[in-house]
């Protein structure tokens, strides 16, 4: 009951505290009821050691949250996940998935638009190579679905920005597993066509250039038992992502 009360209090404070989150760019944003409410919350925050976060995007009863990156402290991906458990409350990563072009590792992206919609985070950013659009929606309490679209038709490279302290990262085929000593786990599940390799306590995933969207499942678990069952669900969701987004 204490956990439930704390979560309700947190989300109520978020809703009451912020306005004008959306900075729409000129690109078309999909139509639908949720897109009529594009300036409700300001949850722009890039994790650092100097300032505190004031609110997170969470949904479907999840205990993980995300924020939009600040335009003046940009990372090219949604920030988080953050563990909302009252006994831990920690950033598992500054950004578990950042996106760039594989042949331009040091290219600088300029933010075009960041936005919170009810049930969705949205961002787009551009470089000299092209524009990358990302959307994040929760599928259930454990997993959020990241959608990535690039207009350049070039190979993409995905990696994490600054995993949290004490987190150990390993790769297993098309899955990245990041474990914290507390028992909390972040798992990133990629589709079979994505090449994933481990680096120095991190990962790099490469995606062939395509006009189609790329999907990544970002999951949060409190222990190994949840992980083993959850990975199968994440893989199933990636096999038909549009069906999960309808739920």
Predicted segments, located by residue:
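Bacterial N-terminal signal peptides
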Residues: 9-17
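Terminal accessory carbohydrate-recognition/targeting modules of carbohydrate-active enzymes
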Residues: 22-247
């Amino acid at each position: 009951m204490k956990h439930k009360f704390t979560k309700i209090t947190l989300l109520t404070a978020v809703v009451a505290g912020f306005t004008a989150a959306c900075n729409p760019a000129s690109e078309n944003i999909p139509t639908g009821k949720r897109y009529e409410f594009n300036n409700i919350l300001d949850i722009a925050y890039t994790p650092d050691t100097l300032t505190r976060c004031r609110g997170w995007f969470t949904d479907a009863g999840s205990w993980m949250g995300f924020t939009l990156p600040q335009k003046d402290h940009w990372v090219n991906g949604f920030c988080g996940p953050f563990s909302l458990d009252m006994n831990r409350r920690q950033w598992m990563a500054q950004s578990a998935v950042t996106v760039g072009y594989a042949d331009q590792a040091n290219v600088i992206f300029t933010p075009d638009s960041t936005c919170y919609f009810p049930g969705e985070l949205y961002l787009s950013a551009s470089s000299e190579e092209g524009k990358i659009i990302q959307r994040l929606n929760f599928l259930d309490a454990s997993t959020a679905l990241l959608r990535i679209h690039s207009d350049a038709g070039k190979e993409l490279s995905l990696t994490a920005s600054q995993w949290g302290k004490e987190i150990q990262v390993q790769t297993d085929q098309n899955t990245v597993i990041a474990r914290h000593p507390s028992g909390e786990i972040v798992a990133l599940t990629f589709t079979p066509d994505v090449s994933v390799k481990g680096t120095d306590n991190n990962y790099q995933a490469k995606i062939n250039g395509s006009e189609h969207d790329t999907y990544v499942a970002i999951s949060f678990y409190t222990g190994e038992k949840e992980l083993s069952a959850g990975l199968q669900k994440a893989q199933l969701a990636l096999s038909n992502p549009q069906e999960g987004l309808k739920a």
